[in-house]
Amino acid sequence: MRIFSPKRYVASVDRIDLDTLWADGKRAILLDRDNTLVPRDTEQVPAALSAWLDTARAKGFKLCMVSNNWHRDQVMASARELGLEAISHAMKPAPFALKAGLKRLGATADEAVLIGDQLYTDVWSGNFAGVDTILVKPQATQDLWYTQIFRIFERRALRDLPCEE
């Protein structure tokens, strides 16, 4: 497996088929926060995403938000609102926070999938930790200046990878 290759590339989190994940033996979902669950610098959770998370819980998935965001209060507030376990200051692409999330959920890497919007943080860390990865399109067009640099390289890397709409 190539370290920067997601298993799937999907338009948004709510487009991911939970029945397929369950059939693939997945029981835990690790989720990035900014631009994956909520647009960056907002607390507004899209209704379709909230419904998807409710369905995931009802099906028996264990869920944990793993965010690089340094504003712990924002991360924890989002997690409480969404009913998720949460880890902030994740320092992805280092895999340590993902492993902590798995431990918190009582899941193995084989049972988990990581969903995120960045190739060089989320996908890299998930693959490094041995977790299947699903890349989603970012929810907002505004990024931090250093993320904008990575997005240039991401666009090149994703040129030939079809996105499941």
Which functions belong to the PLM regions below?
Residues R2-L31, V38-E43, S50-K62, V66, ...:
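Asp-based, Mg2+/Mn2+-dependent phosphohydrolase catalytic module
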